[in-house]
UniProtKB/Swiss-Prot annotation:
Disulfide bridge partners, by residue number: 37-53, 44-58, 52-68, 60-66
Lineage: Eukaryota, Metazoa, Ecdysozoa, Arthropoda, Chelicerata
Organism: Agelena orientalis (Funnel-web spider)
Similarity annotation: Belongs to the neurotoxin 07 (Beta/delta-agtx) family. 02 (aga-3) subfamily.
Domain of life: Eukaryota
Keywords: Amidation, Disulfide bond, Ion channel impairing toxin, Knottin, Neurotoxin, Presynaptic neurotoxin, Secreted, Signal, Toxin, Voltage-gated sodium channel impairing toxin
Modified residues (Serine amide): 72
Localisation: Secreted
Name listed for the protein in its UniProt record: U3-agatoxin-Ao1d
Length: 74
């Protein structure tokens, strides 16, 4: 019984690690496809582009006037 539980826990842990790696790789690929990124203070739209470059996030205080803001200033 202990062996079965240990095997089950090991399998679950292995699955979580593999999924985390797959998610990070997919995220990197998606970021690589974002060639039309804009920087600080420029207009952006997370749902359709242009997207904010790495280190920025799209802040929409009043639609449709969304602007890229620095991640460090959150």
């Amino acid at each position: 019984m202990k062996a079965a539980i240990s095997l089950l826990l090991l399998s679950a842990l292995l699955f979580v690690v593999i999924e985390a790696i797959t998610y990070e790789e997919g995220k990197e690929l998606f970021q690589g496809e974002r060639t039309d990124c804009v920087g600080d203070g420029q207009r952006c739209a997370d749902w359709a582009g242009p997207y904010c470059c790495s280190g920025y996030y799209c802040s929409c205080r009043s639609m449709p006037y969304c602007r890229c803001r620095s991640d460090s200033g959150k």
